[in-house]
Design a protein with these regions (language model features):
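Conserved beta-strand-loop-alpha-helix junction that forms the acyl-donor binding cleft
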Residues: 134-144, 170-180, 196-198
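Conserved acyl-donor/pantetheine-binding loop and adjacent beta-alpha core of acyl/acetyltransferases
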Residues: 78-136
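Conserved catalytic-core motifs of GNAT/GCN5-like acyltransferases
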Residues: 78, 171, 184, 189-204
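Conserved GNAT-fold acetyl-CoA-binding loop/helix
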Residues: 26-46, 85-93
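Conserved acetyl-CoA-binding loop-helix of GNAT-fold acetyltransferases
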Residues: 136, 145-159, 181, 185
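A short beta-loop-alpha structural element at the N-terminal edge
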Residues: 6-20
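Active-site rim helix/loop that mediates acceptor-substrate recognition in acyltransferases
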Residues: 36-58, 63, 72
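Conserved GNAT acetyl-CoA-binding A-motif
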Residues: 131-133, 160-172
Length: 218
């Protein structure tokens, strides 16, 4: 495969590639199969808002006519949250149940992990007045560490500035030291760290999620 990679706006024909990359890399570059095997449900939760409701804020990295990575961006996190809660989330859950999710032990372990996370404070809180936009990046194996993440962020950051928004936030794994260093190099600063419980074998392990923020004043 050649080395020429192009960063460009998302197109509708990229949808399946973006969805496949999402579940195949979501666990710090690894597949989500350790936690949940319903790839459609995972892709719906991770990408459907961005591909179907806000495609103009989605950027892809393309090499030899194949999508090798993406940045899902959002200019209005309040709107994204509403769409997720009212439309995407309920539909994804209902369809997963229809495919037999309730009969799999992994589903109940994941649900219990979410419940334990909620008892520890739940999802990280973000000041959406200061950081209304957000982003998430995933790259295929073999295309990390080549400057593609930097280029994707720079394209999205220009979009945010052109719209006059004050800042961007992102949520990442607390234990992803490489990813955290990258975001810090890109000018993002740590805003908060929140406990996270995940299934591990027949038990659970405690880790964390971290929130990083960037403003045009930083």
């Amino acid at each position: 495969m050649g080395d020429d990679v192009v960063i460009r706006p998302y197109r509708t024909e990229d949808r399946e590639a973006v969805r496949e990359i999402s579940w195949n890399t979501a666990d710090q570059g690894r597949t989500v199969d350790l936690y949940f095997h319903d790839h459609k449900a995972v892709a719906d939760i991770l990408t459907q808002y961005y591909t179907d409701w806000e495609p103009q804020s989605l950027w892809v990295a393309e090499c030899d006519r194949a999508v090798v990575g993406y940045l899902t961006g959002c200019m209005d996190t309040h709107r994204c949250n509403r769409v997720m809660v009212r439309k995407i989330g309920p539909k994804a859950v209902a369809e997963a149940i229809g495919r037999g999710a309730l009969w799999r032990a992994e589903t109940w372990r994941l649900a219990l992990a979410f419940a334990r996370t909620a008892l520890l404070g739940g999802a990280p809180k973000v000041d959406l007045k200061k950081y209304p936009a957000h982003l998430h990046i995933n790259l295929r194996e073999g295309f990390r560490g080549r400057g593609l993440g930097r280029q994707l962020i720079e394209h999205f950051r220009r979009q945010v500035q052109e719209q006059g928004l004050p800042g961007i936030h992102l949520v990442a794994w607390g234990e992803n030291e490489c990813g955290r260093r990258f975001f810090e190099v890109m000018g993002f600063r740590l805003l908060r760290q929140q406990p996270l419980v995940l299934p591990e074998g027949r038990g659970f392990r405690r880790t964390s999620t971290v929130v990083y923020g960037w403003t045009k004043e930083d």
